[in-house]
Amino acid sequence: MERLNSKLYLQNCYIIKENERLRKKAQILNQENQQLLFELKQKLSKTKNSSGSNQGNNNNNNNLSSSSSASG
């Protein structure tokens, strides 16, 4: 019985250490993920802002061409 307890204790210690290792790894991955998400949002925001003015002009041009072809 004592031998079984010792074996289970050692397994438990191993599991606890492995759990700590995985928790640290998950924390690092989460930080990397948050950083990548932040960078992606910045890039999307920049491209949206820079293409937003061009897209507005394109929409106006499309509306004009649609209007002229519909009335023509």
Swiss-Prot record:
Alphabetic keyword roster: Coiled coil, Transcription, Transcription regulation
Q: Do the record's keywords include Coiled coil?
A: yes
The knockout outcome noted for this protein's gene is:
Zpr3 and zpr4 double mutants exhibit homeotic transformation and ectopic meristem activity.
InterPro entries membership: ZPR
Q: What induces it?
A: Up-regulated in response to increased HD-ZIPIII activity. Up-regulated by REV.
Q: Return the annotated region ranges for Disordered.
A: 42-72
Q: Where is the composition biased (Low complexity)?
A: 49-72
Coiled-coil stretches are 14-44
Provide the function of this protein. Answer: Competitive inhibitor of the HD-ZIPIII transcription factors in shoot apical meristem (SAM) development. Acts by forming non-functional heterodimers. Part of a negative feedback loop. Essential for proper functioning of stem cells in the SAM.
Q: How does it assemble?
A: Interacts with REV.
* Protein's UniProt name: Protein LITTLE ZIPPER 4
